[in-house]
A protein has these predicted regions:
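P-loop NTPase catalytic core of nucleic-acid-dependent motor ATPases
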Residues: 2-130
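Conserved nucleotide-binding/hydrolysis micro-motifs of P-loop NTPases
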Residues: 140-141, 182-184
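Hydrophobic alpha-helical scaffolding
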Residues: 85, 118, 136-143, 164, ...
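A Trp-anchored, charged/polar loop motif used as the substrate-binding/catalytic surface
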Residues: 49, 156-160, 180
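Substrate-gripping "pore-loop 1 plus following alpha2 helix"
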Residues: 106-121, 148-167
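Conserved AAA+/SF3 P-loop NTPase catalytic/coupling segment centered on the Walker-B
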Residues: 130-154, 169
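AAA+/SF3 P-loop NTPase mechanochemical coupling elements
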Residues: 123-129, 162-180
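Short beta-strand segments
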Residues: 65, 79-82, 135-136, 178-181
Length: 184
């Protein structure tokens, strides 16, 4: 049994919200890790190759760790840019694999097209409920981002969503939104 320094009702977010996708995680998949040191060294080597500048590496790791919290205090839209083949996607693939159902991919059209009519189905947004990390790929050259839509998604306010043939519901997004770009 674990003792917590604060009571669950005093926490800024409900423990139930933090653990809503826990049923999809196999906690017995790795009962013991015999080669932890090797794993740790391999992970550090991998991240050092992708993010060789120490200050940028620290920022990146801090950002990725913030994805786990389910809080969006920063209200940010993050653009990861750089030449193709520099490891951006591999790092996101690793993070997505680690986060399982807590991560998702979103179409960039969510930010490049006009807002949908009120009450229209929005399955892209409905799927983000409870997610901690959402990733988009770069827009086409002539596309512009709908800043109002971006603010709505990342602004830490409740949004309304509706899956196909479902009733609308409101929720506060918990995810960090990353757009992966080779060019800006």
């Amino acid at each position: 049994r674990v003792s917590m320094p604060v009571k669950p009702k005093q926490m800024p977010i409900s423990l139930d919200n933090m653990l809503e996708s826990f049923h999809n995680i196999d906690v017995n998949a790795f009962p013991e890790m015999r080669n932890y040191k090797r794993f740790y060294d391999d992970m550090n080597d991998f991240i050092d190759k992708i993010v060789p500048i120490p200050s940028v590496k620290n920022y990146t790791l801090r950002f990725l760790s913030k994805c786990l919290s389910g809080e969006n205090r920063d209200e940010g839209f993050y653009i990861w840019t750089g030449t193709g083949g520099n490891g951006k996607s591999k790092l996101i693939d690793l993070m997505s694999m680690c986060m399982g159902d807590y991560s998702c991919n979103l179409p960039i059209a969510l930010l490049t097209q006009k807002r949908k009519a009120s009450g229209a189905a929005s399955p892209e947004m409905a799927v983000t409920k409870g997610k901690r990390l959402a990733v988009m790929q770069e827009p086409d050259v002539n596309e512009t981002l709908n800043v109002g839509q971006m603010k709505e998604i990342t602004g830490n306010d409740k949004i309304s969503a509706r899956g196909l043939y479902k009733e609308p519901f409101e929720f506060t997004p918990q995810f960090k939104l990353i757009c992966m770009c080779n060019d800006l």
